[in-house]
Amino acid sequence: MLALFIHTTGVLSKLLSEAVEAIEPGPVEGIRATGANKLEEILYGVLPQVMPLLISYSLYRFESNVRSATVVGMVGAGGIGVTLWEAIRGFQFQQTCALMVLIIVTVSLLDFLSQRLRKHFI
């Protein structure tokens, strides 16, 4: 799980830096022209342009990490992946089916909630 966290942090940092570099300079210059300090330039000029992308990227990476956690768990990192792997290895088909349904419902619910959050914030 630490590996997923480190990888996600790196990816989100890179995407955020790319988003900040691609902002429109007009709003920042307008805020600077009013005599705002650097913090106010960031709060009112940069963040409003970057937040929709940051929210979207963060939700995507969260969804991706939930899916990846199952696979990583199957190879020994723990969690529901280990339980699923043990059920598969033990030919416990009812438990395997129940776990698969649980995983599918969880991922589908997260996708639905993520979609709703994107519509609300973006």
UniProtKB/Swiss-Prot annotation:
If the reading frame is restored, the complex is composed of two ATP-binding proteins (PhnC), two transmembrane proteins (PhnE) and a solute-binding protein (PhnD). Belongs to the binding-protein-dependent transport system permease family. It is found in: Cell inner membrane. It comes from the Bacteria. Keywords: Cell inner membrane, Cell membrane, Membrane, Phosphonate transport, Transmembrane, Transmembrane helix, Transport. The keyword Metal-binding does not apply. This is Putative cryptic phosphonate transport system permease protein PhnE2. The chain crosses the membrane at residues 3-23, 39-59, 68-88, 93-113. It is a multi-pass membrane protein. Residues 1-114 form the ABC transmembrane type-1 domain. GO terms for biological process: organic phosphonate transport; transmembrane transport. The keyword Cell membrane applies. It comes from Escherichia coli (strain K12). Its main location: membrane. C-terminal fragment of the PhnE protein, part of a phosphonate usage operon that is cryptic in K12 strains. Growth of K12 strains on phosphonate can be observed when it is used as the sole phosphorus source after a 60 hour lag period, suggesting the operon is activated. An intact PhnE in strain B is (AC A0A140NFA3). Part of the binding-protein-dependent transport system for phosphonates; probably responsible for the translocation of the substrate across the membrane. GO terms for cellular component: plasma membrane.
